[in-house]
Amino acid sequence: MSQDYIATIGLEVHVQLKTRSKMFCACPVEYGATPNTHTCPTCLGLPGALPVMNEEALKLTILTGLMLGCKIADVCKFDRKSYYYPDMPKNYQISQYDMPLCLGGGVPLHDLAYPKDAQKSIATKDKVVRLTRIHLEEDVAKSFHLENSSGIDFNRAGTPPPRQSGMSYCEIW
């Protein structure tokens, strides 16, 4: 095997913003609610329904960007990422890519970032995980599968995306 290549590993980490309403409509976010009880024409993608930005999500994202040393964009834009999945009622996802809200920045790693029961201690002085961007997007609905059937819970459609465990990130290092 040639030694001319250097492995480059990138991570895409999703964080769920704790907001009272969905990303682009006023439907409440209540996890564990009865399926399909928190939906509206906007999050179901019905004709004529227009999205309205969740101001709370915008503020939380800007605050996060400032805490992580990102450049906060003067102008950002949202795109419709088109694809078809049964749990995407609009056949597109509202997301950001080339003009995100936050650019650059980084997450400083410290010894305290590792759980006390970690198997080995890793010196992390001056180590920073560099960020490319922080952007906002909505989540898709939740598919569930039973023994003889499947269903879709649209309560989650249009919410900020679900979080992934911070521990899973620490395990990579």
Model-derived features: where do they sit?
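Basic, nucleic-acid-interacting segments
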Residues: M1-W173
